[in-house]
């Protein structure tokens, strides 16, 4: 089956050329990948291999700290958790990664795969590494809530009751005083890819902290 052919954003060609040191004419086989909630991505090839170009979506500057993401990606690459990352521009948010040919997502019903994924999580949690960013699910949720309220009242049925429960749970968690460690914070099967050599890659580090 042939892939839908496409074109990259005009600025992408210069970005790719500057990092991969290829000419525009060497960038080919472009097609859009399934879009995420916050970004748009395209597959492309050069004489050196297959890659992914990611362009941040409109408004993501309010949701994602790109400097923190780049710091996390470099860490993940250095400790062997993500072999796809190549480069991110922290000012504009675009990113280049290696495309994993014939990769598959983690099968949550495969005990061996899940065990391997858990070992990856433990490697991260016990790495002793630190990131400048602190990610707190509750505080992030309250920040998103504030952004929504700038647009008007939140009318989702049951929202206020659920928010009150979150307030109570957060208070208990903070009172616990448990030590913190670096975490991925978007750890689920779509972000855990297995390549043709059965190596796992933990991708999408936008919320790590």
Regions found by a protein language model. Give the residues of each.
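A broad structural signal for short, well-ordered beta-strand segments within beta-sheet-rich domains
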Residues: 24-27, 78, 199
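ATP-binding pocket architecture of kinase catalytic cores
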Residues: 31-139, 144-161, 175-179
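Juxta-kinase regulatory segment immediately upstream of eukaryotic protein kinase catalytic domains
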Residues: 1-29
């Amino acid at each position: 089956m042939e892939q839908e052919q496409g074109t990259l954003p005009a600025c992408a060609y210069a970005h790719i050329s500057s990092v991969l040191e290829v000419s525009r004419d060497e960038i080919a086989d472009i097609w859009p990948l399934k879009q995420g909630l916050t970004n748009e991505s395209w597959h492309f090839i050069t004489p050196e291999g297959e890659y992914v170009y990611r362009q941040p979506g409109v408004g993501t500057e309010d949701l994602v700290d790109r400097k923190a993401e780049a710091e996390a990606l470099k860490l993940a690459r250095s400790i062997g958790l993500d072999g796809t990352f190549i480069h991110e521009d922290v000012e504009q948010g675009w990113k280049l990664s290696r495309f994993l040919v014939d990769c598959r997502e983690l099968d949550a019903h495969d005990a061996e795969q899940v065990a391997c994924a858990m070992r990856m999580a433990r490697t991260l949690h016990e790495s002793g590494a630190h990131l400048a960013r602190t990610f707190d699910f509750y505080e992030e949720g309250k920040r998103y809530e504030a952004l929504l309220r700038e647009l008007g009242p939140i009318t989702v049925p049951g929202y206020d009751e659920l928010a009150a429960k979150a307030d109570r749970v957060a208070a208990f968690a903070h009172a616990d005083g448990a030590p913190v460690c670096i975490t991925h914070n978007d750890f689920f099967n779509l972000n855990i890819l297995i390549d043709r050599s059965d190596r796992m890659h933990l991708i999408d580090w936008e919320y790590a902290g």
